[in-house]
Regions:
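Non-catalytic accessory regions of SAM-dependent methyltransferases
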Residues: 1-126
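Non-catalytic substrate-recognition/targeting regions of SAM-dependent transferases
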Residues: 110-123, 142-218
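Conserved class I S-adenosyl-L-methionine
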Residues: 235-244
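Conserved SAM-binding loop of SAM-dependent methyltransferases across substrates and taxa
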Residues: 245-258
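Conserved SAM-binding motif I beta-strand of class I
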Residues: 259-264
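S-adenosyl-L-methionine
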Residues: 268-310
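Mobile active-site "lid"/loop adjacent to the S-adenosyl-L-methionine
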Residues: 306-336
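C-terminal catalytic and target-recognition region of SAM-dependent MTase-like enzymes
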Residues: 332, 346-408
Length: 408
């Protein structure tokens, strides 16, 4: 076997097949032989097949079931600042290719494994980059990588005022990392004082609280699905369940809906949705602070005249063991929406859970339609926006399902 620059992990044939197929993760139970001296947490290591063939180099995670996350499959790569600069430039060039120019000020700049930055998310909100670091390798790389992020985008003429870290995520514990949030100190720079900003997407303005909002502050993955709803909303009476800060509801209202009701169980979310409606000068909207599971049966009983319903719930499951319960939840809200809609009405329904696969989601929709004595006329099937790329061979990158139906 060729001499390696880094400690070597030998994996079994199962892992070899996954890695050759494009997956970047090595699980601890797939390791046949570990280095005699365990590398430091977050250090680099090589991965080889049972016969010693080089499979890749990645970051070691000693506290995780995912022992190695590959960053390269080229044995000749040197992992210096120039290497990471090229990676950032490549990721940004991809966004410039697949997104419309107006969408580049509110987009996902780095999408973890799909961009070969395992465990790293970087979202851009106007002049702020908001990061979430969920692997120890990326955590240790921050002093090199984060200044490069600002440099590369600025070199392209983008205005970047600062980088804010949203590492208040429980998953960091699996990497032996603490939770925290705050400004990253770019060398020689002072960060902005405010942790709030404004973005524009599809011609709709949003207030973004990237310190306290969910995830990094705003969900960018539905940008083109929101546009699909706006195109269809004109003249309709729309109910947007799980509205969060109002994104689908605002697009429907701006698209010419006769009336839009935005509903969410969170009073804070409703307050933000109202603020966004005011910012956009939309007066054809109402707001309800109510649990969708109670709201839909109540509206059906009262006979409310909605002819377009949007269901964009948070993930009902984040693990395989809870998928069955999650699918029952998805079926309940979709069944109730179909019952509430008149024949000929429209349903937009989504799931952001990777574990609720498209196959399971379609099966659930068929069952809900059967129980509701409705048929579904498919208008569009969509997925996450292309700044959240789906990497074949890495099913974890494929998570968002979005269906637009006429209910007949």
């Amino acid at each position: 076997m060729k001499e390696r620059a880094y400690p070597v992990y030998t994996v079994n044939k199962h892992a070899e097949g996954l890695l050759v197929g494009g997956h970047p993760w090595v699980y601890e139970n797939d390791i046949l032989h570990a280095p005699d001296t365990e590398p430091e947490n977050g250090a680099l290591a090589d991965v080889v097949s049972p016969k010693g063939a080089y499979l890749g180099t990645g970051f070691v995670s000693l506290h995780s079931k995912i022992r190695v996350r590959l960053i390269s499959r080229n044995a000749n790569d040197t992992f210096d600042a120039a290497f990471w600069r090229r990676r950032v430039e490549y990721a940004w060039a991809y966004r410039k290719t697949v997104l419309e120019p107006a969408d580049l000020t509110a987009c996902r700049v780095i999408f973890g494994e799909a961009d070969q930055f395992p465990g790293l998310t970087v979202d851009r909100f106007h002049d702020i980059l908001v990061t979430q670091t969920l692997s120890v390798g990326m955590e240790k790389l921050k002093p090199v990588l984060f200044p490069l992020l600002a440099e590369v985008l600025r070199a392209d003429g983008q205005n970047i005022a600062g980088i804010y870290e949203r590492n208040d995520e429980a998953l960091r514990a699996k990497e032996g990392l603490e939770q925290n949030k705050g400004w990253f100190d770019l060398p020689g720079e002072t960060h902005p004082e405010s942790t709030q900003t404004e973005i524009c997407e599809n011609g709709v303005f949003y207030h973004v609280d990237f310190e306290n909002g969910q995830k990094t502050g705003f969900f960018l993955d539905q940008k083109y699905n929101r546009r699909a709803v706006a195109r269809l909303a004109a003249g309709h009476t729309v109910l947007d369940c799980f509205t969060h800060t109002g994104s689908f509801a605002l697009n429907a209202a701006k698209g010419g809906a006769a009336r839009v009701t935005a509903a969410d169980i969170s009073a804070d979310a409703i307050a933000m949705a109202q603020r966004n409606a005011e910012r956009n000068g939309l007066d054809n909207m109402d707001f309800l602070c109510e649990d969708t599971f109670a709201l839909l049966p109540r509206l059906e009983k009262e006979g409310h005249p909605y002819d377009f319903i949007i269901l964009d719930p948070p993930a009902f499951t984040k693990a395989r063991r809870t998928v069955e319960n999650a699918m029952r939840g998805y079926k309940e809200i979709n069944y109730r929406a179909m019952k509430l809609l008149p024949r000929g009405g429209y349903l937009a329904t989504a799931s952001c859970s990777h574990f609720a696969t498209e196959e399971l989601f379609i099966k659930m929709l068929k069952a809900a339609a059967k129980d509701a004595h409705r048929q579904l006329r498919q208008i569009e099937v969509k997925q996450q926006a292309p700044d959240h790329p789906i990497l074949w061979g890495v099913p974890e990158t494929n998570y968002l399902k979005f269906f637009l139906f006429q209910v007949i």
